[in-house]
Curated annotation (Swiss-Prot):
The gene is tgt. It is an enzyme of class 2 (transferase). This is Queuine tRNA-ribosyltransferase. It comes from Sodalis glossinidius (strain morsitans). Gene3D superfamilies: Queuine tRNA-ribosyltransferase-like (3.20.20.105). InterPro entries: ArchSynthase1/Queuine_TRR, TGT, TGT-like_sf, tRNA_ribo_trans-like. Catalyzes the base-exchange of a guanine (G) residue with the queuine precursor 7-aminomethyl-7-deazaguanine (PreQ1) at position 34 (anticodon wobble position) in tRNAs with GU(N) anticodons (tRNA-Asp, -Asn, -His and -Tyr). Catalysis occurs through a double-displacement mechanism. The nucleophile active site attacks the C1' of nucleotide 34 to detach the guanine base from the RNA, forming a covalent enzyme-RNA intermediate. The proton acceptor active site deprotonates the incoming PreQ1, allowing a nucleophilic attack on the C1' of the ribose to form the product. Its cofactor is Zn(2+). It catalyses: 7-aminomethyl-7-carbaguanine + guanosine(34) in tRNA = 7-aminomethyl-7-carbaguanosine(34) in tRNA + guanine. Belongs to the queuine tRNA-ribosyltransferase family. Binds 1 zinc ion per subunit. Homodimer. Within each dimer, one monomer is responsible for RNA recognition and catalysis, while the other monomer binds to the replacement base PreQ1. The active site is at residues 89, 264. Residues 245-251, 269-273 are annotated as: RNA binding. It comes from the Bacteria.
Amino acid sequence: MEYQLLKTDGQARRGRLVFDRGVVETPAFMPVGTYGTVKGMTPEEVKETGAQILLGNTFHLWLRPGQAVMKLHGDLHDFMQWHGPILTDSGGFQVFSLGDIRKITEEGVYFRNPINGDTIFLSPEKSMEIQYDLGSDIVMIFDECTSYPSDWDYAKQSMEMSLRWAARSRQRFDELGNHNALFGIIQGSVYEDLRDVSVKRLVEIGFDGYAVGGLAVGEPKADMHRILAHLCPQIPADKPRYLMGVGKPEDLVEGVRRGIDMFDCVMPTRNARNGHLFVTDGVVKIRNARYKDDVAPLDAECDCYTCRNYSRAYLHHLDRCNEILGARLNTIHNLRYYQRLMAGLRQAIDEGKLEHFVGEFYRRTGKPAPPLVVELHNNEGI
């Protein structure tokens, strides 16, 4: 993998990731394909939304179908028939999310298999081996996602163990002769001094990119923005920066403004299945009765298959009837919305007009702008 930094606008970066399997324009949003599928979508449909890279889930694909089945097909690309780049998480977030059915030790994590109840063990070394078999274009180190709230002492202990796991991940990755990319994950909760230690030591170990973990786990938005603004300038400029598990459209905008290059989140697909649709002027909750006889397209400014062919009334009808097609059409639209948002951010950075784009985004969606954005716009007369 090669990262090319093409342009900057303030802290925002316009770049390009070059893989053997294709090019990814950044800032980029990665749809989530937890089980080897973006729910309800064929790979061709996902590609048509503008997505250039997907995220897969190491933990779930390890449990089912397992490494043996994956290797029979070649790798995850062959298994799911997506031949663009794939990033896989390491399983570390499952440490965070499984709660009471886990036990964290220095060597790794013991889980109770949520499928059959068996006790299983996942270590940094095992995570690297699974991701090697998956053929991941971007491999993530194995870490612990520190919960929120955590006091400083616990956050320090967790961050330091994640650093030891990072070194073990790096060693096993190299032993396997893996020629793909390996990303480090910066931890430290909402404490700037801990984040400083984490990023410094990860850079000393050396990785192909750096992810910001442990955010969007319940902390106030102001803390997320503060940590990103503090942290991004410390990440080497020639390496991509990935904000894990984020997020809402406004989170993508604010992440880009602070120097983030890559994002992933289940929000566009999960919300689509619940009738919560993102549009240029905000949100359409398609289940509401007001859309029963609305013949307008979902979003007149959107070029997706759904908006080009169907009315709000039809989407409302499908949702009320619990038709599978409704969830699919909603998903197509939400994923396209996210890709259009990222394309708009890229163009704005290219043209040196990011702050104008940000101002228009908040004006059109009717969301309150974070204080920093308000201050900038007031100064610039936007």
